[in-house]
Every structure is written in C-alpha cells, then in structure tokens.
Amino acid sequence: GLLPQPTAQVRDFQQSFNALVENVSKVVIGKTIPIKQCVTALMVGGHILLEDNPGTGKTQLARGLANSISTGFKRVQFTPDLLPSDVVGVTFYDQKRGEFEFREGPIFASIVLADEINRASPKTQSALLEVMEEQKVTVDGVTHDVPQPFIVIATQNPIEQLGTYKLPEAQMDRFLIKTSIGYPGHDVSVDILKQVDITDRAQTISPVLSGDDVMRLRQVATEIYVDDAIREYIVRLVEATRHNEKITVGSSMRGALALTRCARIWAAADGRA
C-alpha cells in the first residue's frame, strides 16, 4: 500500500536537517556524505571522530557545523603537554572572596572541536572521553553539567605520524560516527582555487538553527517508528562483525543502539516517519 504521509513534525525535521547540511556544504564543498553524518550525530546527541590527513577540511567542517547553530563553540588543540584541567577546568581559591571557585574549561560549550586528539596523553584523552560519556564534569567532588546540546567533534591524523597516542578501543566506542572527508575531487579543487580570496569559509555563513531547535528535533527523532524487520537486520549486521576474521573487535550492543538511532535520523531526514 501507500506509505503513510510524514507528519508536520517530520517535515519540519527534514527541512531543518537539509538546511543544516546545505549551510555546512558552503564551507566544505562537495562532501555531502560526511556532512550528513555529522548532522546525524548532532541530531542523535552522539560524538564524531574525523580521521584524515592534514589539510582535508576537518576543522572547517567542525566550525561550519558550529557556525550553523547559534550556540557556543570552543576549540581545543591537543598537545602532549595538555593537562586534563586544561580541558575540563580547574577549582581555584579566590582570596578576595575567601572561597573556592570553579573555572570552566573549553569543554563547556555546545560544540567542542577536539583537534588532533591523538596527540594528547592518554590521561588527558580519558578526561575528555569521560565528559563525552557522562555529559558532566566532576572536579574536586563537585559536579558541573555541560550545556545542551553537547557534541564533541574530534579529529585525528592517521596513526603513522610521529608523536601520537592511539585511542584505545574502549575510547573509540564513545564515538557514534567515525568518518573521513578525503581530498576534494578534481572539479571541486578547481572551483576552490577560483575562490581563492575566501580564506575562511566558516566565517561566511550564518546560523540556521538554535540550540533549542536541535533539542526539539532530537525529541522528534526518538519517536520515529522502527519496524521489527529493521531491528532484526541491525542485530544481524552487528553479529556479522563478530564473526569476520578481518575485524579484530566486533561491534557491541552500543553499536546496535547507535545504528538504530542513526537509522531513525536518516529516515526522518528523508521524510519517512
């Protein structure tokens, strides 16, 4: 029979999703799939790992997404000497007021770009990943919530490079999506060179959604119908990763849940409810 018509909410979701993708596409040209993946992660409330060579536009993609939403954005450049407190914040004694005060680190933003995460020490990496998982920071026994929506876009250069610490498997599991942008195609490269006077594309776009819009759209996505046949297929996919000699560690149940959440977003973005 005919497919049910999408509700007004789903149509709104589809329009908002596409508006975000189109906006970021002005910054990173000709890379619709990785952009859609990033917007999907934002709508799910998951985090993204971009693994790519230097100069492929990882930072531009993150900033393009951040500038498309009227919320806070912070960038942390990871280095071997970066301390956990440089990321999450620190408690200090205010002598004037005679009390302890918490100074927020750059993790307290709606969109956090964690640049070159594999350059940081394992201790600093795990401080970041803990916040990603818990959505809050605990320093000296006091808990501070991060703002919502909250999404970390981490970048890493491929492992062969010197002076990098590989992310452990357990940490990789905290990311909803791992993707790469890759170099632009020939024609796109020529187009980019034609517009050589634009040095920072991310500055040229304006927000299309607010943080509250994102939270509302997330709610819409959780109500998208998932058929049992789809669940069956997702479980079969996940099980297949555990019985393949080319894969050292198969997907966990977390992977199955992530697939389900992403499928809902993908369906809503396609106008299917």
Annotate each PLM feature.
Residues 53, 87, 155:
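P-loop (Walker A) phosphate-binding loop of NTP-binding proteins
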Residues 36-40, 93-113:
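Conserved alpha-helical scaffold flanking the Walker A/P-loop in AAA+ ATPase domains
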